[in-house]
Amino acid sequence: DFDREIAPILATYCLECHKDGNIKGKLNLTTKAGIEKGGKSGPAVVSGKVGKIETSPLLVRVMANEMPPKTPLPIKDKLLLEKWVLAGAIWGANPEAPIDPFRFSTSGRAGYDWWSLKALMPTATPMNFNLNPIDAFILEKLKGSGLSQNPQADKRTLLKRLSFDLIGLAPTPDEYANFLADVSTNSYEKQVDRLLASPHYGERWARHWLDVARFGETDGFERNQKRPNAWPYRDWVIRALNEDMPFDHFARLQIAGDVLEPNNPDAVRATGFLVGGVYNTVLGNDQMRSANRQDELEDLVGTVGQAFLGLTVNCARCHDHKFDPISMEDYYRMAATLSGVNHGERSLPLPGLAQKIENAERLTKNLETELEALEAPIRSALIKERAKTIPVTQHPPKPFISWDLRHALIDSETGLALQPQGPVQLTPSGARLADNSYLKSEPIGKTLHEKTLETWVQVNPGQQQGGAPVSLFKPIDATFDAIVYAELEKNRWMAGSDFFRRTKSFQSTDTLEPEPNTWVHLAITYHANGNITGYRDGKPYGQTYQSSGLLPFEAGQSRVLVGCRLEPAGGNKMFTGTIAQVRLYDRALTLEEVKSSFQHGDIWPNRREVVEKMPPKDQLRHKALLTQRIELTTELQKARSTQGEKAYAVVAQKPNETRILARGDHTKPGKLAKPGVLKALGELELDANASDTERRVHLARWMTSPENPLFARVAVNRLWLLHFGAGLVDTPSDFGFNGGQPSHPALLDWLATVFIQKKYSLKALHKLLVTCATYKQASTPRADALAKDVDNRLLWRMRKKRLEGEVLRDAMLQASGILNLQVGGPGFSDYKVTDTGNGTTYYEPFDSDAPELQRRSIYRFSPRGGETSMLDLFDCPDCATAAPKRTATTTPLQALNLWNGPIAIRLAGTMAEKIKNETKMNQEQVQQVYQKTLGRNPSEIEAKLAGELASQHGLRAVCRVLLNSNEFLMVE
């Protein structure tokens, strides 16, 4: 059977050197045509023709052990190949289908059949009803190696281990005393429940997740500017963990919370995960921006892939993954799925506000329908009468917003007002703008994608370069689309945009300056497909061009500016001239509609003129409806301008087209990549025009599906790593070929299955892990076990762990009695921030005894590249990259810093002073130092030596010694 027997042999042993992109000897073995064509030696085999070994160069070299060159084929596989060739080398069920080089694992790479990509195999627990199921798996493997587990650790050691593991703080003297005095059979389990219910549990485990999420509070790169509102994501992680949010929901919110639950502020905060990484704010030219965007997408794809799937998907940006079954197409499909994600700050939705806005919008729409029913017949009659002398092909289009600046600053359609900014002159000809004056509207009441900007202007050409008669502007991210004059090309109009992102030349041949005191009609249409078309005096202006795509201008966030491109206006190129009319349409007008609007000029009647022609009864009805509509408009504007808390989170944009880039080079786009996922884990492909919402929602649901074997495996392995010091898979973010193999594969799959069954409860999984006998073992080494398993992969003892840098700092603050346990809210900063004035920011650490700076380290401001001697020396990772598994070094500088560092000396002194204020007896003071640092009383010899040290060098010296002791630094 070719598909079951021959294809796996070719994929395993041959395709590394004989496939598309890597064809040695000009021999491609992935297709029937390739194998029949052969290479330098002629056809490799001839399909359908019964042959002999000698007639197949492929088989001759295989049987002679020349191929594969390094390791000959096993006898069994040689015989199968021989049988296949002699029978006529029939290709398979589909002769046209190539062999997928990723289908089978080989000695050099993983295939679709790699262990981590297979469905979960929930093996039955080994039969021992007296054991926690975890212990049954562990003991079965230990027994096979002739080893046994260590005895259980003493109660004091267990409580310290449990407390540091679950909340990152040492047990207090009272907690030690209560546990030691509790002789009930469930005393340990009660401590587990107490610690899991603590608000400090979320703080402890949020730190682990923030390492994976590469969370930082500055942008990185050379500017490295602060992100003052990044902290809401950190607080959300803490709350979610404390509330035991199901881990699948926890993951989905971080990928698509803002679109899954748009009215939930926590769901928006959660998307801080996607934008938690570095962000280059040095914009440069178009080429630099394009290259930078590809780097951002690589960070997104890599972070999502490693955090939730344990796969280095980002390694396939420039070529197919060298070791895992991930193609370039897979990578770019994932990149397309996340291509609507952008960095930025956004206001969080306020409870009930969205519903209030929705109700007001619905009522407004109903009122507008009634108003239109009254106005439409009269408006049509007036237009028809006025148009008798004008050769037009159709009625002019109805604008969404229309200002006639010769009469008023109030929109005749919606009542939206323009506010003068600076010395605007209102004349019978229109608004005369000079001396940096302009007009600004209130937020518009409708989200616009497609649109048309239209205006009648008189330009002062000698004073004009780069100003905008009309601009649609979104302050939240300073994006705008505008009609702009003479900025990039002298005497020419263009579609202005933020940093020229959607701006190209219209290629107009009209280079004459506008005549002074001559009215010019201008319109620019923005189409759904990204096309932008310019018009002047009702005719196409140059050529339509394809932009990078539409941006949404959201209701309540976007304004119309007249005479200015964007705010703040200082330093902007301003429009100088007179503007008579400004219109905004909620769609892209056609050529005929633009032509009609130009030809009609002033024949479009305003609302006042229409109402004057109504019968008195209709006028009264119209007035009542209009009054209600104006009240609703005011209410809507107030609601939309209500700002919630700010958070650094995903600012969604319309996804741009994604193409597979040759060697990852943004200047060499190739085949279109539709949004989708990894082929190795199942098919999911969306249309190329799918919205950002569709893309991220599908990704989040696919990724967290119980059918995805990686999601639960990766999650339970992270918890195992952090409790036991090493994962069942030793590479927590790489379950691919270069990652570790599971030490206990059956246990891993059993845990993943239980995790799913328990509805992804992390607290339930914690409890399962920390109540097993394997976790409660003593950490004492044994010679017999070390001889067989020096790395303790079989878990015959518990690993000793040194406190991580942040936990060490918190423990020192706790022992000194000044740890500030305030939970949540903006963090503290022990950095002096220096802005050089050229856009670069520096962060210099300092030490202080201010109470707000003694909070837990999870709340400490985290700048990228910020140095803090103690934390850095104790292996705190820089947040520029993810750190799924921290290193643990041992260096002389650690000892020097812990003994002589300013923080250590200050806290030792603080502890000594507090104790001396509480008791005057030297013996009691020494006892207090031991209780606060080690949670126990000193032995007789310890008390004697510590008393002598205190007498000679002061109590602070005793505090310094114990803060440097292994017993303080290590968790047994």
Task: Name every feature range the model reports, one short phrase each.
Residues 128-161, 165, 169-200, 215-262, ...:
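Primarily short, surface-exposed interaction patches in extracytoplasmic proteins
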Residues 115, 221, 243, 275-405, ...:
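Active-site histidine-acidic residue metal-binding/catalytic motifs
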Residues 1-82, 91-140, 156-161, 171-177, ...:
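Solvent-exposed helix-loop boundary motif
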Residues 19-22, 26-29, 70, 93-98, ...:
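Short, solvent-exposed loop/turn and secondary-structure capping segments
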Residues 375-645, 812:
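Extracellular glycan-associated modules
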Residues 277-289, 309-312, 431, 495-498, ...:
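Active-site-adjacent bridging/hinge elements
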Residues 187-328, 334-335, 339, 458-460, ...:
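Extended surface/linker regions that mediate inter-domain or inter-protein docking
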